[in-house]
From Swiss-Prot:
InterPro entries: Ribosomal_uL3, Ribosomal_uL3_bac/org-type, Ribosomal_uL3_CS, Transl_B-barrel_sf. Keywords: Ribonucleoprotein, Ribosomal protein, RNA-binding, rRNA-binding. This is Large ribosomal subunit protein uL3. GO terms for cellular component: cytosolic large ribosomal subunit. It comes from Corynebacterium jeikeium (strain K411). Belongs to the universal ribosomal protein uL3 family.
Amino acid sequence: MSDIEIKGILGKKLGMTQIFDEENRVVPVTVVEAGPCVVTQVRSKETDGYEAVQIAFGEIDPRKVNKPAAGHFKKAGVTPRRHVAEIRVADASSYEVGQDVTVDIFNDVKFVDVTGTTKGKGYAGGMKRHGFAGQGAAHGNQAAHRRVGSIGQAATPGRVFKGKRMAGRMGNDRVTQQNLKLAKVDAESNLLLIKGAVPGVNGGLVVVKTAVKGGAHA
């Protein structure tokens, strides 16, 4: 595992706005309501074979929680939460069950990775889904302006190779945006202001973690 200390929190994407930096330049940011989360389980190398911390986020009516989940929350001594996620860490001994996790953990962090589920676009063609150029607008083109074009060879190999980029379902995928600059941490309102766009719809669940590629504290 990397030497970087990985910290993570669950949150909800609220939308985008803009702020001004120290040089009065406009910076587009995504506002994420991150936490407060609560630790529901701590995994150690001795008992589980790896180090991780399980955190829970979001309110939910206890009547809507199934019995296995309700028992898990009861064992941890916390009220039921809507979302649960596990964050791999280098050393989980600094966490304990019932502990609150807030945006304060990112006070000294400059870059983060954000994981979310992208907007679903439904069935999309090659131009929208993969950025294909399409075909000529005139010069003999007839009803093929947005078609994909050739998808392979002839009798040899006599098939379409796996992974060929074609039309199909687009979006609704779990993706991670890496090395996004953390513009501001608002501890009072439990908000993270992240430069640029992050995956998903407004109100969607996101996981914000310390950037793994070495630039987190740059």
